Amino acid sequence: MDSNDVFKKLKSLANPKNVAGMARFGINPKNTLGISIPHLRKLAKELGKDHQLAQQLWDSGIHEAMILAGMVDDPKLVTKKQMDLWTSDFDSWDVCDQVCMNLFDKTPLAFQKAKEWAMRDKEFEKRAGFALMACLAWHDKEAGDVRFAQFFPLIKQAASDERNFVKKAVNWALRQIGKRNRNLNKMAIGTAKEILKMDSKIAKWIASDAIRELTSQAVQKRLT
């Protein structure tokens, strides 16, 4: 299936009724077709890995095509330049998160980029840094605790950022790292307690929400 066939397929799956619903969840409705993630996953499975196709999909600027690009790209072929270019194109939280969880967290540059982007000013670039931290904590089964411990100062530093899509990603990263194992759980709770002392409503929300989950019986039972 070449890129023209893929774009035809995407248009055939379009559901304009879904676009309004997506907008209510804070998803940018611009260039959006209203295709569900399960439909995109199914199409990605049919297409297999294709680095060139991924670039063509991304360059289209179509919301779902950009998500699909992250699903079909080959993480072994992704460069630092591509990661920065794609991140600078993020204009919706779901594209950001899907690309981080389907592609970026599988690249050798993931830990480096998470730290870099967490220091950025643009809302979705900054979100990408913390979303990538959360995805690495969720998916990377081999990385040691030291690599995740390096994220805590960045989480603390961004905890007073009032922008909705940043604060939620900071909270997500803190919770996800803290659910990885018992040692990181203690470190995450300690970081949350430090954040709780900050003179910021946003910081207090991030910290209290994380502490509530990380100290819960359900999470504590699963820790090793």
Regions found by a protein language model. Give the residues of each.
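Alpha-helical scaffold domains
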Residues: 1-224
